[in-house]
From Swiss-Prot:
Gene: rpsG
Function of the protein: One of the primary rRNA binding proteins, it binds directly to 16S rRNA where it nucleates assembly of the head domain of the 30S subunit. Is located at the subunit interface close to the decoding center, probably blocks exit of the E-site tRNA.
GO cellular component, one term: small ribosomal subunit
Pfam families: Ribosomal_S7 (PF00177)
Name assigned to this protein: Small ribosomal subunit protein uS7
Organism this protein belongs to: Prochlorococcus marinus (strain SARG / CCMP1375 / SS120)
Family: Belongs to the universal ribosomal protein uS7 family.
A biological-process GO annotation: translation
Domain of life assignment: Bacteria
Gene3D superfamilies cross-referenced by the UniProt entry: Ribosomal protein S7 domain
Molecular-function GO terms, alphabetical: rRNA binding; structural constituent of ribosome; tRNA binding
Complexes and interactors: Part of the 30S ribosomal subunit. Contacts proteins S9 and S11.
Key word rRNA-binding present: yes
HAMAP family membership: Ribosomal_uS7_B (MF_00480_B)
Keyword line: Ribonucleoprotein, Ribosomal protein, RNA-binding, rRNA-binding, tRNA-binding
């Protein structure tokens, strides 16, 4: 890794099928062992199932689900004089979105269901309705930050 300067962040191009940047990011999180076409198929099937069940626009529901699962604050460990404090910090938008996508995929994988598409569709619909494990994780993260508010002055 170069010490000279940080690598330039490449822009995320919108997904060719859904014309959506978040869909591209979701495909990247779903992908295992470089199998991008399989990940795209899973997302497309999940959107099909969402459309079937709700009758609404799956992209709209997907964006709502991500918004509902995105944390605004998190706690980070900070050592001060031999003690480790959980310091609450604001989450940048990019990191928040990445965390939400990661949680949605991980909790989808741990769900009981037939296929990954069914599990992902279920988790996305739950998140859009402010339920589900990803939203619960966000609330948990916010509670932790609220409980450790006293250490906010240790922010770096």
């Amino acid at each position: 890794m170069s010490r000279r300067n940080a690598a330039e962040k490449r822009p995320v191009l919108p997904d060719p099928q859904f014309n959506n940047r978040l869909a591209t990011m979701m495909v990247a999180r779903l992908m295992k062992h470089g199998k991008k076409s399989t990940a795209q198929k899973i997302l497309s099937q999940a959107f099909g199932l969402i459309n079937e069940r709700t009758g609404g626009d799956p992209i709209e529901l997907f964006e709502t689900a991500i918004k509902n699962a995105t944390p605004l604050v998190e706690v980070r460990a900070r050592r001060v004089g031999g003690a480790t404090y959980q310091v609450p910090m604001e989450v940048r938008q990019e990191r928040g979105t990445a965390m939400a996508l990661r949680w949605l995929v991980n909790f989808s994988r741990s769900r009981n269901g037939r296929s990954m598409a069914h599990k992902l569709a279920g988790e996305l619909m739950d998140a859009a309705n402010e339920a589900g494990n990803a939203v619960r994780k966000r609330e948990e993260t916010h509670k932790m930050a609220e409980a450790n508010k006293a250490f906010a002055h240790y922010r770096y």
